Curated annotation (Swiss-Prot):
The gene is wnt6. InterPro entries: Wnt (IPR005817), Wnt_C (IPR043158), Wnt_CS (IPR018161). Keywords: Developmental protein, Disulfide bond, Extracellular matrix, Glycoprotein, Lipoprotein, Secreted, Wnt signaling pathway. Coiled coil: none annotated. GO terms for cellular component: extracellular space. SMART domains: WNT1. It comes from Xenopus laevis. One of its GO terms (biological process) is cell fate commitment. One of its GO terms (molecular function) is cytokine activity. This is Protein Wnt-6. The lineage of its organism: Eukaryota, Metazoa, Chordata, Craniata, Vertebrata. At tailbud: dorsal, punctate; in adult: brain and heart.
Length: 129
């Protein structure tokens, strides 16, 4: 929530307040935190309730993320899902996030390759002095 005062000479005769969205980065960080703590669940016999699977004792609350099926392994090619896998992809060796080699190469290691590209820049030299 953010507020602004109104009035003569800065006196706060009345205040206007409004709800404000958090910064995009903050929203992403919250989602990642919830994703990393997501609960695996299965449906109850009554068809309405969910039951946590595994060693989780506390049932998930309304703000927790839940899932019922494991995600496929995107590291390996899978014809059934149409996933080409990550083998042979270009990665960033210095990045620690999604495009980084540690995550993208799935622990297989990577091969570094330096590519030199020569291009004709159509530059011209002008003698000035």
């Amino acid at each position: 929530q953010e507020c602004k005062c109104h009035g003569l000479s800065g006196s706060c005769t009345f205040t206007t307040c409004w709800k404000k969205m958090p910064h995009f980065r903050e929203v992403g960080d919250r989602l990642l935190e919830r994703f990393n703590g997501a609960f695996k669940v299965m449906g109850g016999n009554d068809g309405k309730t969910i039951i946590p699977v595994g060693h989780n004792i506390k049932p998930p609350d309304k703000q927790d993320l839940i899932y019922s099926a494991e995600s496929p392994d995107f590291c390996q090619a899978n014809r059934k899902t149409g996933s080409p896998g990550t083998r042979g992809r270009v990665c960033n060796s210095t990045a620690l996030d999604v495009g980084g080699c540690d995550l993208l190469c799935c622990g297989r290691g990577q091969r570094e390759e330096t590519v030199v590209v020569e291009e004709n820049c159509l530059c011209r030299f002008h003698w000035c002095c």
